[in-house]
Amino acid sequence: MGNIHIQTKSKEYDVYVGKESLSHLTTIVQNMKPSVSNIMIISDEAVASLHLQMVVDALQIEKKVFSFVVPSGEKEKSFENFYAAHTSALENKLDRNSLIIALGGGMIGDLAGFVAASFMRGIRFVQVPTTLLAHDSAVGGKVAINHPLGKNMIGAFHQPEAVVYHTPFLQSLPEKEWRSGYAEVIKHALIGDVKLYHWLKEEVQTLADLRDEKLIHILTKAIPVKANIVAQDETEKGVRAHLNFGHTLGHALEKELGYGNITHGDGVAVGMLFAIFLSEQVYKVNLAYEEMKQWFLKYGYPKMPSDLNVERLVGLMKQDKKANAGAIHMVLMQEYGVVNVVSIPDETVHIALEAFQKDMV
């Protein structure tokens, strides 16, 4: 098992990664000061049916524990569920000394974290991620819900008390969720750990390799990339935006295709390829785009859909949180491990997207 220490300006906490990580949950709760009054577990239907009782059993404490369960899927990260969670919290008499446990993937972590950030102006919460994708979202304190006009547009920065990454929970994931989460692993390697990138190319030939000791190795290498960036820039005023590599187009694809019709990781994978494609043009460098494209396709990542309207995508990219004064800002790569946020004219993005779309046919 590997423990990773996270340090930000507002809080320090640990990420527990391994096959026995759930055993730490009781101690984490018992050591909180002031003592926890009661506990609300927020989860989704798919995860709750598999893991909720195990988490309740792991909480060997004499506190009231209750659950709030929403349907599964990114579209459930909504204001309606956010409001309903607050209603449940009030009905079950949560107070300022209560604790929320986010049990699930990134959607649940974002929803539960935002409930914790806003209930009585902020109470404590613990992340218990159940997906590979959540190795990214569970760390760093960004919590949010979606708006019909954009993803993660309503939210806050609210750090957890701890992250408990019990890797056996991941074994129930379907292949598409392994692939989705692996895209964020690749992202962390490309922007902040070139040694990990080369290790992935050698050691992860198929998604089935993302198991056991290799999985723990990946998590204990990828999470510190994010931790180091968050330590420098907790509230995304500068370098934290580098973590959005691939996300400008990725989020646009999610919005255009409809949440649930493309996974977050698949969208980010296409977005990273486009960012590399455009970076070669902007920086006049060779980033081995063709080789990277074949590597991504080997894992089953999708191609850029040929029937999407490029002009609409450009419009959606201008709604990205990095956009400034109506201009598209993208994270581009100078070389592996070195990225920058760059303002790109609409016409340049449009021309590049059309060329990228044709190349991916």
From Swiss-Prot:
Record-level GO cellular component terms? cytoplasm
Q: Where is the protein localized?
A: Cytoplasm
Q: Which residues form a coiled coil?
A: none
* An MF annotation (GO) of this entry: nucleotide binding
According to its UniProt record, the EC number is: 4.2.3.4
Q: Which enzyme class?
A: lyase
> What residues bind Zn(2+), as annotated?
E184, H247, H264
Record pathway: Metabolic intermediate biosynthesis; chorismate biosynthesis; chorismate from D-erythrose 4-phosphate and phosphoenolpyruvate: step 2/7
Q: Which UniProt keywords apply?
A: Amino-acid biosynthesis, Aromatic amino acid biosynthesis, Cobalt, Cytoplasm, Lyase, Metal-binding, NAD, Nucleotide-binding, Zinc
Name of the protein in its database record: 3-dehydroquinate synthase
The organism that produces this protein has a lineage beginning with:
Bacteria, Bacillati, Bacillota, Bacilli, Bacillales
Tell me the name of the encoding gene: aroB
